[in-house]
């Protein structure tokens, strides 16, 4: 009957409106979180990093005393020149904690850049592992996958890690798509695990296989070549100067 048709029409319309509203909310929520994450990081960079006038250094100083008053989980600062990778590094007893939390403790799907809970916070381990989300906007470690291109590496062969004690140059050794249980995810990886990464690296490093005394940093983010794929970039730490 006409009444049944009309009722069906309104029921379908209500469902479509519900779907539209939910989708709209999801889109709004996504971009709202992106903007909140970007704004907060810009504020952190503005408030706690110091570039001295007239200095030609590529890197900068970080006011760790003030930054740690905001959050005592801050262990370091990671910086890739000519890139959005310019973030404090946090560490918590639970690796899941900063997957969805910002430095101020607020919930955000962008999360934070964070160090593996197993690592010593002063980079004294053989291999320090640092994680970040692969955001489609390029935030966090979204741009780390640029190292899948050798030409990008040729223009960006090093990063900087600032800590409360020492500033380091991070000379990049290899980048590879790996399984989440790859033996490289160890605070003391074997020489064979490192050699395997170098053999399949997405860029041609200028470095030789490092000796046992070298300290390494592994940067890790999601990749999409297969289920649970990860993309890692490994570098060798070189101390530049004491910061205390």
Language model segments and positions:
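Solvent-exposed, non-transmembrane regions of membrane-associated and secreted proteins
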Residues: 17-244
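Short, small-residue-biased leader/transition segments that mark boundaries at the very start
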Residues: 1-5
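Alpha-helical transmembrane segments
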Residues: 7-18
């Amino acid at each position: 009957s006409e009444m049944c048709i009309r009722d069906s029409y309104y029921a379908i319309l209500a469902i479509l409106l519900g779907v539209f509203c939910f989708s709209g909310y999801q889109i709004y929520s996504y971009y709202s979180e992106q903007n909140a994450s970007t704004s907060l990081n810009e504020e952190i960079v503005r408030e706690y990093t110091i570039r001295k006038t007239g200095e030609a250094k590529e890197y900068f100083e970080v006011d760790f005393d003030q930054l740690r008053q905001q959050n005592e989980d801050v262990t370091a600062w990671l910086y890739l020149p000519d890139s959005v990778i310019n973030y404090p590094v946090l560490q918590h007893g639970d690796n899941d904690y900063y997957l969805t939390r910002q430095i101020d403790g607020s919930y955000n799907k962008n999360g934070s850049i964070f160090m593996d809970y197993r690592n010593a916070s002063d980079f004294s381990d053989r291999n320090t592992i640092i994680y970040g989300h692969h955001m489609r906007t390029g935030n966090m470690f979204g741009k780390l996958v640029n190292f899948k291109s050798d030409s990008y590496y040729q223009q960006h062969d090093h990063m900087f890690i600032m800590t409360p004690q020492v500033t380091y140059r991070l000379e990049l050794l290899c980048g590879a798509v790996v399984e989440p249980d790859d033996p490289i995810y160890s605070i003391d990886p074997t020489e064979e695990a490192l050699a395997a990464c170098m053999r399949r690296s997405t860029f041609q490093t200028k470095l030789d296989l490092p000796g046992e005394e070298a300290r390494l940093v592994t940067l890790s983010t999601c990749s999409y070549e297969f289920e649970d794929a990860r993309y890692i970039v490994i570098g060798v730490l070189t101390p530049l100067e004491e910061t205390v």
